[in-house]
Amino acid sequence: MELKELEYIVAVAEEQSISKAADRLYLAQSSLSQYVSRYEAELGVKLFRRTSGGVRTTAAGDLFLKNARQMLLQYHQVRQQLTDLDAPMEGQIHFGISTFRGSYLFPKAMHLFRQESPTVDVVLHEHDSIYLQRKIAAGELDLALVAFREDQWENQGKFLMKDEVLLVANRDSPVMEYVREGGGGPDRPWVELSEIGHLDFLLSSRSAMLGSIAQKQFDDLGIHPKFVCGTQTASMSAALARRGVGISFTYRSCIEESRDVIYLSIGKSRCYVNLALIYPQEGYRSRAIRAFENAICRVLASEVF
């Protein structure tokens, strides 16, 4: 079995669908299905259970998957080390960032990095911070920019900055009746969350970082707000809020300024997340990875939040 074939098995397991994995790998679905069947025949065990909803790993598949990921990680690290010996900087970086934050920060970092390191490819993995932490722990990414709740921060990775969690709404929203300025509060308009719990809210999934922060804020106050629309992504929630559908949570680093939109701090003490770059604990950080990390840090340092 070749290393690329290990990647096929990993892709099928992650996508839980042969058709989706085939799209990801740029293979014909029939070819990938034949590959999987052949591997299973060679090994003498079933790696996947076929169901009406896709494929799921068996116990044997879980064991195979764990070892396949380790082998791919080791191969990738050895290649990076060999590349770093005396060759020009090149290779491939697997970088993770949330789609929401990535749409604002990644293009700037990538533009800067490509100017300085045109022979290095960056493979982008867009997921929420919670999922990216798991991918890093499994050694499946080289680097990820993630957010940690303040109560979860334990000096994990390289701290970059605090990013404020804000509320976003259209200026025609009834939340405007509760907006305060000054009074010992933040340097921007702010509201007490306890006073607006009866208004319409939009929330992203609790499994995502911003969704989990919002739910914790409400839970701590014993509030059960009315959710007018549940979405899977923070970007969709914010977009709906800007159009006046309800109130949503967003990050200061992801503000889209508009005369019709207001961004509000949450309470006098505000709410923050810690942004950090994280890496596999035992991973090798190549020159290319370090250079890309530097590009991200320079972009963040140039931004005014």
Residue ranges and their predicted role:
Residues V10-A28:
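Short helix-boundary/capping micro-motifs
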Residues I18-A21, S30, S37, Q133, ...:
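Residues within helix-turn-helix
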Residues E40-A59:
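A short LG(V/I)-centered, amphipathic sequence patch enriched
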Residues E90-W153, G230-T231:
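Central regulatory/effector-binding core of bacterial HTH transcription factors
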Residues L105, Y263-F305:
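A late-sequence structural motif
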Residues D128-L132, A137-E140, V146-A147, S207-L264:
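Hydrophobic hinge/microswitch elements
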Residues W153-F159, D163, V191, S235-E282:
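Beta-alpha-beta core module
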Residues Y178-V179, G183-L221, R285-I289, E293, ...:
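Secondary-structure junction motif
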